[in-house]
Amino acid sequence: MNYKLYWELTNEGGARLLRAFGETPEPRFPAEIEGRAITEIGDYCFAAQAHLPAECRCSYVQAETEADGAPETAPDGEMQAEPETDGAPETAPDREADVMPGADGTPGAAPGADGALAELAGAYITRVTLPEGVKKIGNFAFYNATELAELELGSGIDTLGSDAFMNCRSLSRLLLHAYPGQKTGLRLLLAQLSSDLEVALSGENGVWAKLLFPEYYESYDEIAPAHIFGRNIVGEGFRARQSFREDVLDFAQYDKIFPQACVDESETTLGRLALDRVRYAAELSEAPRGLYEEYLKAHSGYLIRRITDDRDLELAEDCCSRKFLTREDVAACAMRAGEADWAEGAAALLHLMQQYFAEKTPDERYSFDDF
């Protein structure tokens, strides 16, 4: 994957990414630029408005793929800005023919048949993978990235600028590279994201924990005539976001929100939260596990809708194996799949019904004629 990256040196000798152009709305950025580790994301880097400094470097980079080795910087000296001998950065190049930037601060156009690169900013980007070594995300870094749905990054974030995710209305998933017990920058990220957010923690063997942080709202009421404002918080998502101990995620504290959440939150929110905890049961003790499982068994209708709406047979088998669904539930799920013209799902669900539940008498058996 080819990228054109504008950047500058940090005081520590790393690279601060300022602006990026690429071939896909789901960029996966390299770890280095010209041998410099990318450690910072600059102010407004992925925002719809460009805020490049007067002087910065520009490099063409071929990013690493699963089949390739380490990322390489384009060797052509005419396409790659080199630092001056005195170490001072070069002036940022003018807009070039191979880049299709947006007008009036809007995101760049999508890559065209001529190989043009799109400006990776604003509404164009949908999923971003930041380099593992990034420690700082600048002010308004993702401002007005309205279609950004998922962000993948390492555990080392220790500085997050003001309103880094302002107007990122579609951002609903974080994939964080971390191992159990590790300090992360998740608390900082959650403090700026108040909408529903599913966080997956991934290590060498894949995802080992998945948590839903529900949406919450804040409001302030003036207490007249002293002009004192009272703070009101609605939603258990706020308490969930406090489940940290010295920047380490505290699963036991997180699990304590569920009883009150059952009073305040919707069935969809509670179902997602409970499923994530029992399917990725990191540090899950028996008492909260029992509460989650009891809730799911009592709300099989949610599971049926989710299986058929998402067409998720893996979830269906998981629910059968954990006895969250009864034989009648699976039959209803198969019926709903048939009504949705999901023939493959209906057949698979009937197979699961036979596999996990004892057959009834011949008169009670279901057949494809029922669907």
Where do the PLM segments sit?
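Conserved hydrophobic site in ankyrin repeats
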Residues: 318-320, 349
